[in-house]
Each structure stands twice: as structure tokens, then as C-alpha cells.
Amino acid sequence: MASGTRGYSSYRGRGRKGKIFLAILLILIILASVAFIIAREHMSYDADGNLHFQLPWAKQAEEPIQPPETPDVEIQESDPADEAGRVSMIQAVQLGDDPAEWETQLSAGEYNAFAVTVKASDGTLNYPFETTVPGRTVSGRAEAVRAALPQLLDGEKYSIARLSCLRDGSIARQNLETMGLKNTGGYVFYDGNNENWLDPAKEATRTYLASLAVECADLGFDEILLTDLTYPTMGKLDKIDYGSADGFTDQAAYQAEQIAGLLQTVQEALAGRNVKLSLELPETVYENGGVDKTGGIDLYNGLMSRLARVYVPIAPEKVDALVTETVGNGTLVPELTEVPETVSYKCYLLMNP
């Protein structure tokens, strides 16, 4: 009989194939778990509850980047009256020289506006402007005006700065070459009232007046009323050295161009500021179609397009007759010494109340 145990051989377990199978199964389970975790990040349900997969590369190809939604914003358009200076039909009062009396003058009537003279018709400055030139004259009340103005300008009433332009003897005499109006002999010109004037054709004159207007706007005035924007109209006018009129049809056209040029300089200096620009005209000039060849005024040719209003000193009984379709609805402002009840055009500047 053969030696050893019969019917048995050495035991080797289940063998290598079983171990390989288990390893593969374990790997598949791990991969499936990882795939499920990744898939969850790209799973979504629609409104009907159906499951969808959104693969990252497919999403980038199919869906363009959407800009963030802009919230609905209600745009409030500003009132044209506010942009133009808050009111159109003004009932204004011209305040006097003494700031201590201003509140009394304002409360004496139902005014929605007021005017303050910042540069008088003789050239005197009633406000201590930062703009300086040799020969300027500053009023003794200038500091009182500076102190009183902020309260008025911060109030609800419409504000007008009255600014005289070319009748300024002291500056004309001390700055004759750069600013003064000369006679034909080369000296300063004296008009019929023995007064001296600035020359509107000279750049320094334009710059000075434009700078004053800018300061008025920056103070907070709603409107700047220019007065004495004219050449002299009294005296020996043939003795004025107006400058060369070469290239112009006549002397009057040259003078009108200089006045219009000065107004343009002021207007351009005020660009970007919410302020109106207005002009005072004598009654005779306004009734003559806005033309004064001697003074260089041609209202509807170079001036009116730059103006918001025209102020005209006039008798109360003539007011309604002056109003036209072209100049009315607040564009024309009569300067009155009294306001009669019979006037239907309720727009005025009351002088010397």
C-alpha cells in the first residue's frame, strides 16, 4: 500500500481567481460611489419632478453667460421749471442797499422772488468778490451783504443777482489799455454824464465780467440779470474809438458783434451751472424791435438766443401791451414802481418799494 493519507491532497483555498474577483468587485463599488457623489452635483429636477443631468462641459457649451439682472428702477424726470430756475412767472422785489432792511422788504408783499444788486450802475461792488482788478470799488456794506446773503439764498424764494456791466469809470480809467473805452485821441472817453465805460471788445473786460457772473452762480443765485450791457448812447459819440470795423457791413454791425461776443463769453463761462442769464433793456429799445444801433443792441440777432428773460422798465399801464407770443410767459419781466390790480400779466420786478 502506498504510504501517506489516501484520498487527500494539500489544500490551497479558493485559489487566485477568487481573490481577483473580490478585488475587482471592491474597485467597482468604490468607483460607483465616487461617480454617484460627482453625479449629485450635476443632478436637477424640473417642474414636473423629472431628473436631469447637466454635465459641466455641456452646460458651458449650451448656456451663454447671463449678465446679472438689473433691478427695476423708477426714473423720476426733473421738473422743467426746476431746471430752468424753479419759477417762470416771477413776482420779485428789488432789495435795497442795506441788508438790515431786506427781511422787512421781503415780507411787505407776496413775492416769490427777489433781486440783489451785486454790482451797481457806477461800477461799485456790493459784494466782496474774489475776482479783482486794479481800480475796483467795493461798497462799505459789502461784508454785511456777504453775511446776509446765505440765509436768503438758502430759502425758497427765487434769487436774482443784478450785475451792471460796462459803465465802470474807476476800472476804465486805471486799466485804459486793457479794459477802458477810449476816445479817438487815445484817452479815456467821457460820455454826456461825464462817466467812463469799459470796452466790450477787449478780452480783459469780457473775462472780468464773466468771472463775476460765475461767482454769482457759485453763490447760489438762480438768475443773473445783466444791466448796462451797451455802448454809451449819450455825449460826443463820434469821438469814441470803437476799433476797426473792417469786415463788417457798417459800424453798427461791428458794435452789435462786440456786445453779442461779450454775452457769449459770459454764457460760456456759466456752462454747466443751473443759472439763468437775463438782460435789462430800456423801454425805447424794446419797443424799437430790440434794436439800438448806437448802443450795439440787436436783441433778436445774437442776444435773445442766449437769454432766459428780458427786463424792461416801464409804466404799469403799458405792461399788457408789451406781451407777445414771442416774449411772454415769464420771458418778459416788466420793472415797475407799483403793481396795479388791473394788470393781467402777473410777472414783474418791483423797484424801490
Q: Which residues make up each language-model segment?
A:
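Catalytic domains of carbohydrate-active enzymes, especially glycoside hydrolases
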Residues: P99-L125, E215-T227, G302-Y311
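Aromatic- and acidic-residue-enriched segments that line the glycan-binding/catalytic groove
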Residues: P128-R136, D168-F189, P232-D246
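Active-site-adjacent "subsite" loops/lids of carbohydrate-active enzymes
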Residues: E83-Q94, L166-V214
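N-terminal Lys/Arg-rich, disordered targeting/topogenic segments
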Residues: M1-G18
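Substrate-binding cleft of secreted/luminal carbohydrate-active enzymes
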Residues: I38-A47, L299-P353
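Glycine-rich, aromatic-flanked loop segments that form ligand/cofactor-binding clefts
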Residues: A113, R141-F189
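Aromatic-lined carbohydrate-recognition surfaces of secreted/lumenal glycan-active proteins
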Residues: Q94, I160-R167, L225-D228, A252-G296, ...
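N-terminal, intrinsically disordered, polar/charged segments of Gram-positive cell-envelope systems
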Residues: H42-M89
